[in-house]
């Protein structure tokens, strides 16, 4: 009788060990996925910063061209 109890206990312990092993593997996979996603987030943030700088530069260029155009139109009005 005690041998059967021991076998059942051993089977439960083995099942627990197998479950823990699978969970550890899943944790490692999730950690790797998390690291990958963090890298993607950092890359996206870096890209965003670059695009914001480029957008500001383009806005300044647009303002400069608008000023030039206004000046040119003003000169044309003076001629007429």
Curated annotation (Swiss-Prot):
Keyword Transferase: no
Disulfide bonds: none
Gene (UniProt): zapB
Sections of the chain in a coiled coil: 3-80
Name by which UniProt lists this protein: Cell division protein ZapB
Organism: Edwardsiella ictaluri (strain 93-146)
Described function: Non-essential, abundant cell division factor that is required for proper Z-ring formation. It is recruited early to the divisome by direct interaction with FtsZ, stimulating Z-ring assembly and thereby promoting cell division earlier in the cell cycle. Its recruitment to the Z-ring requires functional FtsA or ZipA.
Subunit-structure text: Homodimer. The ends of the coiled-coil dimer bind to each other, forming polymers. Interacts with FtsZ.
One GO location term (cellular component): cytoplasm
InterPro entries in the cross-refs: Cell_div_ZapB
